[in-house]
Amino acid sequence: MPPTKRISSSKKKKKLDRSNSKGNVNNSITAPDLNEVISQADVALETSDIDNALKLYTYASTNLKIELQKMTENIIASEEEREALILSLSKVLGKMAEIKVSIGDHFGGRQDFTDATNLLNGEAVSNNPISKAQWKEARANLYLYLGQLTNCTDALNAFQTAIGDLKDCIVLLDSALQDGDIQDDNVQNALIETKQQLCGAYCSVAELYLTDLCYEPNAENACEEALQLALQLDDPKSSPDALQAMANLRLSQKRNKEALNLVLNAYNRVREGCEAMADLVGLSNKEAEEANDVRVEAKELQGDALEAANSLPGFEFRCQMAKLLLECASLVETIDSLNDGDKKKQKNSCVEASIQVLGSLLAENDEVIEIWFLLGCAFSSADPKNSQSARYYFENSLEMLQNVKKIMEQGDIDDEESMTALNEIDEKITEVQEKLDLLGDDDEDMEED
């Protein structure tokens, strides 16, 4: 689930040609190299210079389409050259689509994705296995994005198309390596990355059966099958998508002990990065005792800690992990195979893990109200309960909600959508206030003791 830098626009170069006969000066503009334009667009996108990135990609796509049309009309051009141009254009269209979706233009994004997939219809003509694999991998990426933009069976069809292409891509890359035709670390890395993509695609299918397609007759079996295939591809060094998705399924099946083990294993994959990030906001294991520990002096990540933090899964994924950890903590008492001591230990393991994950999210973005609320829930779920820390985070989330409500009430709330949003804020305020009231009762009990 799931955080700004700038790049200057490119300048057109001018070439001056002087005529010896009349002394006239003719200015001619040399067109920018499209590869350079695309490189600049990539950098702009990576540094969140969205407007410039979209302009550069749009310029590149327009000119690549012109080149493709010329190449189609030129019978001398080779199929390999044409395929390379199509691949380049499809990737540019895909990047444009990503940007448009990110700024709310879902229709434009979907159109660009569709145009890109249409370019890659059919099979690559080249006999080179690497070229064939690149073709299929590019098309798979587009369908994975389309799956995220659509719902129900449309999304399922997109994911299944991507899965088919990724499986073919793996066969091509593996065959090339096994035959000894190619000995290249880049190809080996591409094979590993493609397997990870396939693992993620299976997880996306499973997620569909847990949500949009949950009422399908075969939903549970289809979800289980997809996740078993994902786990076969799971790499202990990669993101724990499959483990977390399986934990979610096991919770829905009331198989709580399995879910507990799965989500803790998933957390162990990201623990180092989460702890490093949580330490930035005073939520490391040794600093989480007091609520005021969040007010610590600025710290900076370095070395292994920085690398671990940079490799963390996205914001939404970690937020979901924290919720699963808290849910498992609340269900430990239902696991009959654990004795009382083990139940307390496992519960606190889940709670502490959730605090570290939420701390990493708070360090990334401290303006998400839900993270403050969930931290309050985590500290109040500990055994023994950390009421002081829980109160600190609940009070901050309450203040943020009240500020949002005040801003909304200052605007126009005549339409149904605004009224619904305001009602949701009121419900959340009530929920947080109830949590604080319960903490007040706990404080009174402690004083009596």
Can you say where each PLM-predicted feature lies in the sequence?
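Structural motif corresponding to the intra-repeat A-B loop/turn of tetratricopeptide repeats
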Residues: 47, 96, 103, 149, ...
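"A position-specific structural signal for the A-helix of alpha-solenoid helical repeats
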Residues: 39-40, 88, 95, 138-141, ...
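Alpha-helical segment of the N-proximal tetratricopeptide repeat
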Residues: 32-66, 102, 152, 203-214, ...
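Structured C-terminal portions of repeat-based eukaryotic scaffold domains
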Residues: 49, 255-435, 446-449
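Residue register within tetratricopeptide repeats
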Residues: 51, 107, 153, 157, ...
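Residue at a conserved register position within TPR or TPR-like alpha-solenoid repeats
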Residues: 44, 93, 100, 143, ...
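Residues that mark the junctions of alpha-helical repeat units in TPR/alpha-solenoid scaffolds
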Residues: 33, 53, 82, 89, ...
